[in-house]
Amino acid sequence: MAVSSARTLKGPRRFVRRVAHRANSPQWQFLRGFLKNPVMVGSVIPSSKVLIDKMLGPVRWDEVKLFVEYGPGVGTFTRPVLDRLPPDAKLIAIDTNPDFIEYLEKDIGDDRLIAVTGSAADVRKIIESHGFDHADYVLSGLPFSTLPPGVGAAIGEATANVIR
């Protein structure tokens, strides 16, 4: 009977291990962030590779010193930006969700990444606190259509004031 009980538990243990492993995946972190605050995440799934390549295609990477990303989430764009970013450049990723920032800091081991918990509306203060006076590029993953009234306009104005 003990052998039978051990076999019975083997299935659930395997399931628990599988779920625990997936709990740290980017997809799970993204979904959890969406379920926690759908207004601020704005999507159930991260962007596709095709979209990423189209968005990053026009960037003149050899001229970039500072790239800013709003709403990096689990790093769907962060990783490809870092793949293309020159060795002497920086990426400042700003997100209001501290869980996403913590995930990026743990998951991406790149000294060029500066992950900040904060609002994109404070981009001027954030980049200046890291020694920059302007950004060469700003990429936004923010769900502007679901942001509270006035926040989108404030972010737009702040962005216009820091972009080169």
Spans of model-derived segments:
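S-adenosyl-L-methionine
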Residues: I101-F132
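A short glycine-rich, Lys/Arg-flanked "PGG" loop and its adjoining helix->strand segment in the class I
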Residues: A153-R164
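Class I SAM-dependent methyltransferase Rossmann-like catalytic core
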Residues: Q29-D62
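A short SAM/SAH-binding and catalytic strip from SAM-dependent methyltransferases
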Residues: D136-G150
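Conserved class I S-adenosyl-L-methionine
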Residues: E63-G73
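N-terminal auxiliary segments of SAM/dcSAM-dependent transferases
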Residues: A2-P26
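Conserved SAM-binding loop of SAM-dependent methyltransferases across substrates and taxa
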Residues: V74-P86
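Conserved SAM-binding motif I beta-strand of class I
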Residues: K90-D95
